[in-house]
């Protein structure tokens, strides 16, 4: 499922970082944002010409909040994306996730994975996803790197591959990786109904034209198999 280059805005959640360091992070985020510019709703686009005043303010607010200790990115992102923007289909899918979310021991990522497939993914994509899900539960498994390798090698443009490699490298920088943090936040039944709703909202918006590296990686978690080519890439 293609989607407007999802929010690859890297936030420093831990405290004690210098102001100059925070500014660097914001600049890096803006660089990612520029890569993702395309048609359709795209929260992460902070470019003034592309967003309404309200969207600009919400985006800027999220960037500033990113330096606050204990910042809950997902909750604030929900407020930016959900207000009056969901279609009936999006609402139905979100409702399903909300219902699932009330179950004890709910694994949000797994349910989101199921919702992602739901007639929207090819058999090849579904198989890759299922394998990644299984691998992801193994101790010592480098989930993000494996996922990035599966989706980038020989399949992405030079710019997209560069972004993938950049994300892998960031994993070892100062112990911070926004994408990993977000996945951890989504797992283990700790998300609210609103968080779950947001996830499905983002998934359904994937029908918009444009490439979204983050969503493609998440989509790879949906049901299914890996093609021979993808299996080779993963070895």
UniProtKB/Swiss-Prot annotation:
Expressed by the skin dorsal glands. The modification Lysine amide is found at residues 188, 223. Keywords: Amidation, Antibiotic, Antimicrobial, Cleavage on pair of basic residues, Secreted, Signal. Its main location: secreted. The keyword Glycosyltransferase does not apply. Residues 19-35, 52-65, 87-100, 122-135, 157-170, 192-205, 227-235 form a propeptide. GO terms for biological process: defense response to bacterium. Residues 1-18 form the signal peptide. Coiled coil: none annotated. The modification Asparagine amide is found at residues 83, 118, 153. GO terms for cellular component: extracellular region. The keyword Signal applies. Belongs to the maximin-S family. Maximin-S1 has no antimicrobial activity. Has no hemolytic activity. Maximin-S2 has an activity against mycoplasma but has no activity against common Gram-positive and Gram-negative bacteria nor fungi. Has no hemolytic activity. This is Maximins-S type A.
